[in-house]
């Protein structure tokens, strides 16, 4: 190993030494130019970042429970007092944050016969005002009630806590708690 690389490895922070070692740069010797080292570090870190981002998107899909069938959801939603429709064309909905389908609301369950864009940590809220943007959601969140977790991205059923009085609210919202992203909403009264 060249004396230049030895000196750099001693001076460098631990993380940089680990990256240099992991890339095999130390074994290559002095023939490698500094620009090439930086290029390799940047490209490898970029690929790693892409992999983590892809994992964040795919992991919820892989660990999601099996969704209920349309017949099962229809049976549960037969006692619904209200219904609404999730649509893809809301202001803050996009190709990664959307929902579509029939939402049925009863004092026991809120169901969706349809699908949501996959993502982590989805929560179902009720609001006294219609919401279709992250700004509106954050502004009104203190007046909303959390119903529960949405665990599937197709045909979900969420149990409604007994202390929630449905006529007080008029909008059902799916929100990604981890990333603070609006997914979808529908006004049911």
Where are these regions (language model features)?
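N-terminal targeting leaders characterized by basic, low-complexity, disordered sequences
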Residues: 1-9
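Hydrophobic membrane-insertion alpha-helices, especially the h-region
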Residues: 39-57
């Amino acid at each position: 190993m060249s004396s230049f690389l030895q000196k750099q490895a001693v001076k460098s922070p631990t993380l940089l030494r680990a990256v240099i070692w992991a890339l095999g740069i130390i074994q290559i010797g002095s023939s490698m130019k500094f620009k090439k080292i930086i290029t390799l570090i940047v490209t490898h870190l970029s690929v790693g970042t892409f992999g983590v981002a892809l994992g964040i998107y795919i992991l919820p899909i892989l660990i999601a429970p099996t969704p209920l069938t349309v017949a099962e959801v229809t049976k549960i939603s037969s006692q619904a007092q209200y219904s609404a429709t999730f649509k893809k064309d809301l202001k803050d909905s996009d190709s990664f944050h959307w929902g579509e389908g029939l939402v049925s609301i009863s004092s026991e369950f809120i169901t969706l016969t349809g699908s949501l864009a996959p993502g982590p940590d989805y929560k179902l809220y009720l609001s006294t005002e219609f919401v279709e943007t992250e700004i509106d959601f954050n502004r009104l969140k203190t007046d909303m009630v959390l119903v529960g977790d949405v665990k599937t991205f197709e045909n979900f059923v969420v149990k409604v806590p007994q202390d929630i009085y449905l006529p007080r609210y008029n909008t059902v919202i799916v929100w990604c708690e981890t990333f603070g992203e609006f997914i979808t909403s529908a006004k049911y009264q």
